[in-house]
Curated annotation (Swiss-Prot):
The keyword Transferase applies. One of its GO terms (molecular function) is magnesium ion binding. It comes from Pseudomonas syringae pv. syringae (strain B728a). Keywords: Isoprene biosynthesis, Magnesium, Metal-binding, Thiamine biosynthesis, Thiamine pyrophosphate, Transferase. GO terms for cellular component: cytosol. The gene is dxs. This is 1-deoxy-D-xylulose-5-phosphate synthase.
């Protein structure tokens, strides 16, 4: 097995067993003695395929044996297998007929980064966001029972995803309806229990066996006739299990808890899954795996190797280093440290996005003012509200797509009370290869309808810093949305002074057409404006809108064009049209933004072209409208 990136194969490895097991039907024709070798081949294939395309890396390496065991024991796709989030689903995709297409992973019209129902019958539920698997599998189990089917429903969820309240809502509900389902906890950093070994594996086999289950039920019938005897027996059993297993919480919720067992021990996995397959009621299996298993760098640094970029051929010439602009997240990371130095009231909150939101430096410099709440967006927002009530100044660093999960709290707990909370909304707009589940397509639409909300869209790195200060120093809730990646390399001023709220700025004076740019599409607007001699306005604020500037543009131009990387429906352009209607200003308005579809995964530039938001598409749309209005 490779131990360095140089050793990862650049050509498809020889995998005779995997060649025979590229579907679960082929897998089940293999003998159990061959599965260990198959695991080695699948791990090598995963290293090769992700090296060709880039993608999520460590999680898949950690579930090789579990994936094989699940498809070997259960009758997929008839039995429903639901993967939480989907980062770990690449081995599943390879084993379910998509091996030949893995070279298209995360590319336009290629294999998706996450399980998709439209992609394969083995992808029984589309995922991307965390902690949905148990609810989905429970719904499938209930529906199957109502239909008279005996198919099995299995949810595989990681220990990180189990921090979200939604997962526990489902865990609480399933025993109430006596659902025949299996939840597998993939504990890949041993955060819940370290109690793994031969004795624990042996106990799991016994406790999951049909013989033990029958004996337990028989004893219950006999002892229940003797006053107090069954209660004593039950407590003795719990005490004996409690010395070896950490499942008291799940048992109290009504689950039959088995484990923890070694998630890389194929014989134990297969034996335990076979036993649990035949048990009735809600079953819970705790397996412990190692993220990045089999590839030393990923085992040592599972966070750093959560995902990797495409590997270049070994003989490729060294690429010249480019002087790159700072990432927008990096600008935020520097700003929050600077503002924290200036204001001791500042606290930073994130739902498990420290690295992605660039809060590492802040967490190290201000550990007592940094709060990572794990995958708990609802809690993050209301936690910020509580802090604001007591005079702190919370900054919630969150991805646009994940803020959707805390929307009620944003309205009910923050906005209704007009609390001073700044939302630094990263990954706004299209995000590229991760596709529609991770796109920030809707934040302008769902934020601008909230009374009292300050909503801002910077056009470059310097404006981001200024608008963050503006939102932070504002009284009431505020949001600054910014995209993934880098900007145009603007000169960033050190000042923490705010901008005047609700005021845009004219970046280019032209005639005939006025382009009202909301956000980073300003750069494309300026390119188009040079060809059309158009006026370009950097609007900066979606709410409050610079109504005076819009009125002036309407009075002096034949056509107004609104430009945003947000859904056209309800977005910034809609705010412009709503104002014009209220002011009784009749003007032709062209709205350019994201169409009313889910934009599929591709490179960001390809997605913008598809949506008509590159310079060529913007120019074509404007010319088409000008032709219509004569």
């Amino acid at each position: 097995m490779p131990t360095t990136f140089k050793e990862i194969p650049r050509e498809r490895p020889v995998t005779p067993l995997l060649d025979r097991a590229d579907t679960p039907h082929g897998l089940r024709r293999l003998g159990e003695a061959e599965l260990e070798t198959l695991a080695d081949e699948l791990r090598l294939e995963l290293l090769y395929s992700v090296g060709q395309t880039g993608g999520h890396f460590g999680a898949g390496l950690g579930v090789i044996e579990l994936t094989i065991a699940l498809h070997y024991v259960f009758d997929t796709p008839d039995d429903r297998l639901v993967w939480d989030v989907g980062h770990q689903a690449y081995p599943h995709k390879i084993l379910t007929g998509r091996r030949a297409r893995m070279s298209t992973l995360r590319q336009k019209e290629g294999v998706a980064a996450f399980p998709r129902r439209s992609e394969s019958e083995y992808d029984t539920f589309g995922v991307g966001h965390s902690s949905t698997s148990i609810s989905a599998a429970l719904g499938m189990a209930i529906a199957s029972r109502l239909q008279g089917s005996e198919r099995k429903s299995i949810a595989v969820i990681g220990d990180g995803a189990l921090t979200a309240g939604m997962a526990f809502e489902a865990l609480n509900h399933a025993p109430e309806v006596a659902a025949d389902m299996l939840v597998i906890l993939n504990d890949n950093d041993m955060s819940i229990s370290r109690n793994v070994g031969g004795l624990s594996n042996y106990l799991a086999k016994i406790l999951s066996s049909r013989t033990y289950s029958s004996m337990r039920e028989g004893s219950k019938k006999v002892l229940s006739r003797l006053p107090g005897a069954w209660e004593i027996a039950r407590r003795t059993e719990e005490y004996a299990k409690g010395m070896l297993v950490p499942g008291t919480l799940f048992e109290e919720l009504g689950w039959n808890y088995i484990g923890p067992i070694d998630g890389h021990d194929l014989p134990t996995l297969i034996a335990t899954l076979r036993n649990m397959r035949d048990l009735k009621g809600p079953q819970f299996l705790h397996v412990v795996t190692k993220k990045g298993k089999g590839f030393a760098p990923a085992e040592v640094d599972p966070i750093g190797y959560h995902a990797i970029t495409k590997l270049e051929p070994l003989n490729a010439p060294a690429a010249q280093k480019k002087i790159s602009a700072p990432k927008y997240s990096g600008v935020f990371g520097q700003w929050i440290c600077d503002m924290a130095d200036a204001d001791a009231r500042l606290v930073g909150i994130t739902p498990a996005m420290k690295e992605g939101s660039d809060l590492v430096a802040f967490s190290e410099r201000f550990p007592e003012r940094y709060f990572d709440v794990a995958i708990a967006e609802q809690h993050a927002v209301t936690l910020a509200a509580g802090m604001a009530c007591e005079g702190s100044k919370p900054v919630v660093a969150i991805y646009s797509t994940f803020l959707q999960r805390g929307y009620d709290q944003l309205i009910h707990d923050v906005a209704v009370q007009n609390l001073d909370v700044l939302f630094a909304i990263d990954r706004a707009g299209l995000v590229g290869e991760d596709g529609p589940t991770h796109a920030g397509s809707f934040d302008l639409s769902y934020l601008r309808c909230i009374p009292g909300m300050l909503v801002m869209t910077p056009s470059d790195e310097n404006e981001l810093r200024k608008l963050l200060s503006t939102g932070y120093l504002h009284t009431g809730p505020a949001a600054v949305r910014y995209p993934r990646g880098t900007g145009p390399n603007a000169v960033i001023e050190a000042s923490l002074d705010p901008l005047e709220i609700g005021k845009g700025v004219v970046r280019r004076q032209g005639q005939g057409v006025a382009i009202l740019a909301f956000g980073v599409q300003l750069a494309e607007a300026l390119v188009v404006a040079e060809k059309l001699d158009a006026t370009v306005i950097d609007m900066r604020f979606v709410k409050p809108l610079d109504e005076a500037l819009v009125s002036e543009a309407a009075a002096n131009h034949e056509l107004l064009v609104t430009l945003e990387e947000n859904a056209v429906m309800g977005g910034a352009g809609a705010a412009v049209s709503e104002f014009l209607a209220r002011a009784n200003i009749l003007k032709s308005v062209l709205h350019l933004g994201l169409p009313d579809v889910y934009v599929e995964h591709a490179k960001p530039a390809q997605m913008l072209t598809e949506c008509g938001l590159d310079a060529q598409g913007i120019e074509a749309a404007i010319n088409e409208r000008l032709a219509l209005i004569g």
